Amino acid sequence: MIIEFIHGDILDQPGEGLVCSGNVYLNMSGGVNGALLVRGGEALQIQLHQYLQDEGLKFVPPGFVMEIGPEPFAFRSIVYSVAIDGWYDSNIELAAETLTSALSIIESRGCTSVNIPALATGYGKLSKQDFGVALRRVLSAREWGFELVNVVERNAYGLEEIQDGYRGEQE
């Protein structure tokens, strides 16, 4: 498995699967999901809100993941991933649990490449370095079926922090 750390726009990176960061209210308000919404993902937002309505919920629990779309996007699988609580707090364990669940869905769809953002680090209060620690734990915990994992960050300094956390974690 090749792991690439990329400075850029996650939606512009080739990949079959996409982990999409989200919140407990399933609003596509910023980060990756905000970018999806701006680029034609209104149907994804409707799908998320329909889930809440169908289930009689106002919000979902931290760690919730849900496959959405992927139309109109070229990804084979997009997984909306809630790695924060209602106050936007998170921790390494929650980020790792959420990422594991999201990657498991994407892997089950036969995807051999996946694009991953730094979950819980935008509006969420997890540091980029702590996300790197969570990422390392997830990717080293089992044999994943991915040939390529793209970890994508728009901010160059943030990308360095993710890499520091990823490389600094000792098992």
Q: Predicted segments — roles?
A:
Residues M1-E171:
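Macrodomain-like recognition of ADP-ribose-binding/processing modules
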